[in-house]
UniProtKB/Swiss-Prot annotation:
SUPFAM superfamilies cross-referenced by the UniProt entry: D-aminoacid aminotransferase-like PLP-dependent enzymes (SSF56752)
Organism, scientific name: Nematostella vectensis (Starlet sea anemone)
Domain of life: Eukaryota
Protein name, per record: Branched-chain-amino-acid aminotransferase
Function: Catalyzes the first reaction in the catabolism of the essential branched chain amino acids leucine, isoleucine, and valine.
Amino acid sequence: MAARVGLLQTIGKLQSSFLYRAWPKHSINAKQLARQLSSYHDIKSSNLLIEKTNKPKPKPDPNTLVFGKEFTDHALILKWSDEDGWDNPQIIPYGNLSLPPAASALHYGLECFEGMKAYRGDDGKIRMFRPLMNMKRMNNSAARACLPTFNSGEMVECIRKLIHLEREWVPHSNTCSLYIRPTMIGTQASLGVNKANSAMLFVILSPVGPYFRTGTFNPVALLADPQYVRAWPGGVGDCKMGGNYAPTILAQQNAERQGLQQVLWLFGEDHQITEVGTMNMFMFWINENGEKELVTPPLNGLILPGVTRDSLLALAKRWGEFKVTERTFNMQDVLMATEENRMLEMFGSGTACVVCPINRIFYQGKNIMIPTMENLNVTKRVYDELTGIQYGRQEGPKDWIVMVD
C-alpha cells in the first residue's frame, strides 16, 4: 500500500507541475490530486479501531422507550482534513465532543445528517434497512454544504460493525428499533464564511419506540398554514441539514398549541403540498378521471427524497392494482376531493414514523376530515408489508436489507 501511495503521489506531483505550467490560474495541489487518484485517503472499514467502554449502561425496557432519549455505549468517529483526507475510523465510548468555539458548524450551519434504523427480527437476527441509499443521500447533502464526501459502502460497513458491537441494544420488539444517526460537522476554527478545511463524521445509536406520542399507527392531525414556507426552488429542501429543521420549530409549536401533531408544509400561491413535518406525504384518492391513484409530491428540490417514500412507491408499483404517480397537487385538490367523496386516505412516511395515518387537516380556519381510518386499505397494507420486510417476516428486494450478524 505504501509503495502504491508513493507512486500515486509522484504521479500527482508530475501532473500538478504540468497543470500549473499549462493553467497557472487553475493549478491543483499535488496532495489533492494524489488523493483523487487513490482511495487511500477515503474511509476504509478494514482500518477501524475499537476502544470498548469499561462502564456499560443497563439496557432499557422496550416498553418504556420514547424517541431519541436513550443512547448506546459507543459511537463511531471519523475525522477529515483537507490536507490528509479521512483518518482511520474509530469506535469509542459514547461521550461529549470537543470542538473549538469558532467551529464553522456552530456559526454557519456547515452540517448534515442522516437517519436510518436497524431491526431485530422474529428470528433474532438484526437487519439494517437500505443503509446504502441513506449514505448516498448524505453524500449529496455533504456536497451541497461543501463538506467532504466518502465511500458509501465503506461507511455502511463501519456502521454495521458499530451495530454488531452494540447488538444487545437492538430492542427485542416488533414495534421498537435501533435508530442510527450519522452526522457530519465542519470543525474548522474560523469566523470566515468559507468551505471547511476540517470536518468530523460521527454516528450515535438510540433504541427507540414510536416517534409520535399518539403511538404506533395512530392517526395525526396537521396544520396547513401558508404563512410559513419550508423550502423553495434553488434551496436545500432536498438535503438533510440541520438548517432545514430549526426554522420549522415555531410552526410546529403553533400546531401543538392547537391540538395538532404536525405541520403540512405548503408552497406557492396555489398552496402546493410538499412535506409533513418529518415525513413525506401520500394521498390515495379517486382522481378527476375516476381512477384510483396513489399520489405523492415529486422530487423537484422542495422535498427530501425519502428512503421510506422510495420504498413505498416501489411496493405499490409492484402490486399493479392502481395508478401510482409522483406529481404536484395542492390544497384545492384536497378540498374538492373531500367535498366530492373522492378522498380515501392520506398518510406520511419516514424512517422515524415508518407510516403514519392522517385523519384531519386544519386549513384556513376549517377542519378537513380525511377518512383514512375508515378505509386503511393502502395505508395499513404498505405499513404491514414494509415492516414485514424490515423485521424479516417477508422477503423484499434483495438490496434493501443488510444483515448485521
